Swiss-Prot record:
Region (Disordered): 1-30, 203-244
Gene Ontology CC terms, in alphabetical order: cytosolic large ribosomal subunit
SMART domains: Ribosomal_L2, Ribosomal_L2_C
Gene3D superfamilies (alphabetical): 2.30.30.30, Nucleic acid-binding proteins, Ribosomal protein L2, domain 3
PANTHER family: LARGE RIBOSOMAL SUBUNIT PROTEIN UL2, RIBOSOMAL PROTEIN L2
Biological role: One of the primary rRNA binding proteins. Required for association of the 30S and 50S subunits to form the 70S ribosome, for tRNA binding and peptide bond formation. It has been suggested to have peptidyltransferase activity; this is somewhat controversial. Makes several contacts with the 16S rRNA in the 70S ribosome.
The name this protein goes by in its record: Large ribosomal subunit protein uL2
Any single biological process term in GO: cytoplasmic translation
Protein's organism: Nitrosopumilus maritimus (strain SCM1)
Family: Belongs to the universal ribosomal protein uL2 family.
């Protein structure tokens, strides 16, 4: 049996391709699953950094003694009190259903589906804007500029997520960039396919570096061969037809 290509081994998901658990908080940074009708308060007891995550996390302790980790908003500090519930005040760090958030309010860490604990607008320094309320749901303007309509019961955190500008900091060495990608389980550096051996990549091998075949492959190409221009509508330079 021949040796499997690297792309197939990555698809299998072995330990060498997964992000390490070292430096993790040990639990997901989601909203605690409180009933929607209940009102809870928690105190920020610590601000922690999780490996592979640019935005800091707030360690929150509630009145019943339970502890949860949630993404920290810009300006959060130890000792502050966060409110979770429908009757929470419109202040930074509080978690409220978007049906009770006024139009024009800046929010982050929004639930895509009710009860998922926050799934969108979770990157460092990002925020969204509650645009309007309607019969179909609440319309939110995302950081990309697109609009999405969500369930009014979905929860969101008031404010802008902390850690903005972290992605603008330049990498001073290739090793620093490698460690950053390693913590996130991403591949770095990326080697060109034509520079690899024939058994490693479909574009590899030969007396000189060339693809040797069409670089466009179909959408249903099996793993290992699915490299190059995947389901491309057109490739190459655009030709401008001269008008007669």
């Amino acid at each position: 049996m021949g040796k499997r290509p690297l792309v197939r081994r990555r698809g299998r998901g072995g330990n060498q391709f997964r992000s390490t658990s070292t430096g993790k908080v040990g639990t997901k940074a989601n909203y605690p699953r409180f009933p929607l009708s209940e009102q809870h308060e928690g105190e920020i007891i610590d601000l922690v950094h999780e490996r592979g995550r640019e935005a800091p996390l707030a360690k929150v302790r509630f009145e019943d003694g339970s502890v949860s980790f949630v993404p920290a908003v810009l300006g959060a500090k130890v000792g502050e009190t966060l409110q979770f519930g429908l009757k929470s005040k419109i202040e930074k760090g509080n978690v409220i259903s978007i049906q009770n958030i006024p139009d024009g309010t800046i929010v982050c860490n929004i639930e895509k589906h009710f009860g998922d604990g926050g799934a969108i607008v979770k990157s460092a320094g990002t925020d969204a804007t509650v645009f309007s309320h309607g019969d179909e749901g609440v319309t939110v303007k995302l950081p990309s500029g697109k609009f999405t309509t969500l369930n009014p019961k979905n929860r969101a955190m008031i404010g802008t997520l902390a850690g903005g500008g972290a992605s603008e900091r330049p990498f001073m060495s290739a090793g620093g960039k490698w460690r950053n990608f390693k913590a996130k389980g991403k591949k770095y550096p990326i080697v060109r396919g034509v520079a690899q051996a024939a058994y490693v990549h479909p574009h590899g091998g030969g007396r000189h570096q060339h693809v040797g075949q069409s670089s466009t492959v179909s959408r249903d190409t099996p793993p290992g061969a699915k490299v190059g221009s995947i389901a491309a509508r057109k490739t190459g330079r655009a030709r401008i037809k001269e008008r007669k």
